[in-house]
Amino acid sequence: MDTPINVFSEWAQNGKDEGMEKHHRDSVMNMLDFACNGLSEYSLIDAGCGNGWVIRHTSNDNRCSRAIGIDGSSNMITKAKRLDNKNQYYCEDLLNWIPSKKVDIVHSMEVFYYFEDPALLINHITKNWIKKEGRLIMGIDFYYENKASHSWPQECCITIMKLHSEKEWKVFFEKAGLKDVKSWRNGQDKDWGGTLIVTGTN
């Protein structure tokens, strides 16, 4: 068993990170379409950006004024910077980092359950990263209702993976002070619950 950061650092070295883009693209596009709908301009942080593929995609949107990626893995950030010298990337602990300017959208895919206390992270992001009326939107595949994901901690040999229900995730958002909290699932199949998407505004 190993920490999430060490596991994903290894993925950055062996190229496994590239599969994350392929597997998560549809759900990420669903989230970005929802979050950016109706906006004439926006700034965005990708929390747990990995190799930066979401930032590279978002920065090609003419409406995007600023795109920032943050990740705890130095290998991932090194790779992101190598692939993209246009945008900003930071290797920092998400629980401690504060951006110089707040943003309109904070997006995160498959990250929050790797924290011992996800509610603490959501509180920190809501308070310190998001503008008034800004949005937090999160996607995860590891959650209680998605039974196919329950074996992942053992299969991936990762020490911290917090299993919560859809209702519990929504409560985390609400207790952080986020309003109009919504959730839905993208990509459901017969034995697959799909990506749980949760969002709310500041």
Regions found by a protein language model. Give the residues of each.
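A conserved beta-strand element that flanks and buttresses the S-adenosyl-L-methionine
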Residues: 107
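Short, glycine-/aromatic-enriched active-site segment of Class I SAM-dependent methyltransferases
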Residues: 141-160
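Conserved S-adenosyl-L-methionine
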Residues: 178-189
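Conserved class I S-adenosyl-L-methionine
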Residues: 1-37, 144-145
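Conserved beta-strand signature within the Rossmann-like core of class I S-adenosyl-L-methionine
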Residues: 133-141
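A short glycine-rich, Lys/Arg-flanked "PGG" loop and its adjoining helix->strand segment in the class I
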Residues: 119-133
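Class I SAM-dependent methyltransferase SAM/SAH-binding core
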Residues: 45-47, 51-96
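Short alpha-helix
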Residues: 161-176
